Amino acid sequence: MNAIKISFYRGLSNLLLAALFCGTVQGQGRTEYLLEKNWKFSKGDFPQSISPAFDDSKWETVSIPHDWAIKGPFDGNNDSQNVQIVQNGEKTASLKTGRTGGLPFVGKAWYRNTFVAPAFTKGKKAVLLIDGAMSYPKVFLNGEAVGHWAYGYNSFSIDITNKMKVGKNTLAISLENLPEASRWYPGAGLYRNVHVIITDEVSIPVWGTYITTPVINKDFARVKIRTQVNALSGNYTALSLQTTIVNAKGETVASATKTLNEGDLNEFEQDLIVRKPELWSPETPNLYAAITKLYAGGSLKDEYTTTFGIRSIKYEAEKGFSLNGVYRKFKGVCNHHDLGPLGAAINVAALRRQLLLLKDMGCDAIRTSHNMPAPELVKLCDEMGFMLMVESFDEWKAPKVLNGYSHLFDEWAEKDIVNMIHANRNNPSVVMWSIGNEVPDQSTKEGGKILKFLQDICHREDPTRPVTAGMDRIKDALDNNFASVLDIPGFNYKPFWYGEAYKRLPQGMILGSETASTVSSRGVYKFPVVPQKMKMYDDNQSSSYDLEYCNWSQIPDDEFVMQDSLKYVIGEFVWTGFDYLGEPTPYDEKWPSHSSYFGIIDLAGIPKDRFYLYRSKWNPEKPTLHIVPHWTFPGREGQVTPVFAYTNYPSAELFINNKSQGRQSKSKATSTSRYRLMWNNVKYEPGEIKVVAYDANGKPVAEQKVKTAGKPHHIVLASDRKTLMADGKDLAYITASVVDANGNLCPDAENSLSFKVTGNGTYKVVANGDATSLELFHLPKMKAFKGKLVITVQSTEKAGQLNLSVSSKGLKTAVLPIETK
């Protein structure tokens, strides 16, 4: 089993070497194993499987992260819920068939892993760290119980030293997902990573380092580091801690050594000065590393590295939010944790792809709705430049679902908040904590007390960041002073309350913690084109003219107006960045709908038209000119077919078959006319539409064309990656488009496509973004939706080349090579 010395983040490794049983990284006195491969898995209840002698040879062999339910099949009876959704304006309960995705995640299952940790010898300490397990994990080592947790979204650690053996060890983990425990698809299984950390008895515990930057200016930054030490059991007269801070180039920029004498509290506190600090921001995500070395009796006992950033955040009444002294508004999205066709199983390449899409849109912030994020997401946000609102709960004591967090709150809430903060408080991307989302406790007598209880825990564990919560019962929250207690009052879907709330609240600021909830299906256009609330159609789709929304929500433009007009509103987090499994509003009762319509980007990762509306608003540095809709509407000849342009240019002219339809300019007449250019009365005729954009001086600066498509002729493949790492985990996403003989997208094509991967890669999953599709993600075939779908391929551990071929009856086969190295 090989070992390498590497850099760590948050006291944990960010580079892991695959070995026979697991990955391993080793520093002086510390070795970490990633238990990734050769797990045995079975659904059902097998309490006898805790025994090392248990025969699991007939169980499925899996690698983790693993989501046991994502392969389906879809069924409207899976976790169907007879509930009344108050936010939807419902007066009575009704059967919701796709609320949690229609996947078979309810039930019990077991995982087993037999591993060897060569670094574990007599006198060593062993800790098991689980980043997340869905849900109610109970952990057994070598036949004996060692610990448990309840909340499936949280990270937790267990000291397994007393049950660990030199040589072979058997780890068994039981999990159980209850019915009616969620409002969206939660995933199932060991969907995040599992680590075994071996140290000396004298060591620094998991999350034992806490880094803050209390003083920052252009000349220097003061970096304060508090480091805990595990209690001593040896005859050491003194401990000393050496900390070295290095920049991204590996250059030492500060260092300090401190001695801890016998009788002192087991915590070091150090102050280091970094000259001319390079500050962290979404635009410049500069990072530093604090290398920690712990000595006892002159002997090096522990060594690891914590990545952090230097940045200042302020939230000021009347002025709003500033980062590094620059006032700005959050251009954020809310995201659930599933990765579309991959389910809840975490994958760094999939997360990075999501973030790259959001970055191109101009997004600079993410709300981890409605739970703790995977550490990989937080790390990527540090590196790529996204601010994070890290959220904890969807329920407090008042329930929303039958078996939700309300049953856990009294026993687990403080433990869960503490773990959430300790796991994420060194990350510069994290700029606020959220303690809840739309909790019914807003309206109860006890709600304010619960809020203060949770907020006080956050302040105690991390006084450097404010606390918010997403409120939807605004009148109640204002009348009973619930909203007054929060550091940052978060409003969900209430832009028209901002003015009154600002007058009544003491904070002097408001956050749009959840906004818009516009619904649309990529490539679908409905007529007539008018704003509509909870509009439903026979095909279970929603229009991409982006004027349809929910009972509680608005179109994007309404929120834009308030964000632009009110200085004290500090930004927004749109619901949602990506479509997700579950919550198919407005079709909650209309199977086969089983995934959301809210996303700016669909479940396959293809941007909807709305992406370009947000891009035109949020990313002014990059030109945006996008035409809505496509121009292939057989049977609509002579009928009114509005054309929209989403652009950051002030005006544009529309041409249909080279005939001008007039120039439109943005105006403040309505919310939509401020942010969209609209030709509402044009009539459809086949051919070509062209939009020419003009700058502020009236000069033509950009144009875009859309042509009427002919019959499907061939397939075009486009990959987001040209080269993959040969690590057995890296992913490429290939968009397959059905086009006519001239290369125009066939926007209604539903051809069934088949996929084959040869060479040094494997087929992983496919998705088409259709919320009604019951085709299974893991099978190598699927119908195109509105002419497109996305195939995901995975590298092997052997370098070379993989080849993807996509075929369909009557169409020319397309082949795409991708290098792996």
Enumerate the predicted regions with their spans:
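Bacterial Sec-dependent N-terminal signal peptides
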Residues: M1-R30
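Extended carbohydrate-recognition surfaces in non-catalytic/accessory domains of CAZymes
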Residues: Q28-L129, G187-L190, F578, G635-E637
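Accessory beta-strand-rich segments of carbohydrate-active enzymes
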Residues: T31-L35, S42-D45, G101-Y210, L232-S233, ...
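Extended substrate-binding grooves/exosites of carbohydrate-active enzymes
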Residues: K43, D67, K71-P73, E144, ...
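Short flexible loop/turn segments that cap and initiate beta-strands
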Residues: P52-F54, Y236-Q242, E283-A289, N648, ...
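Short, hydrophobic beta-strand segments
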Residues: I160-N162, Q270-L279, L677-Y684, F777-E797
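Extended acidic/polar, glycine-enriched regions
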Residues: K165-V166, R226-E316, W679, E685-P686, ...
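Beta-strand-rich structural segments
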Residues: I225-V229, I291-K293, V643-T647, V692-A693, ...
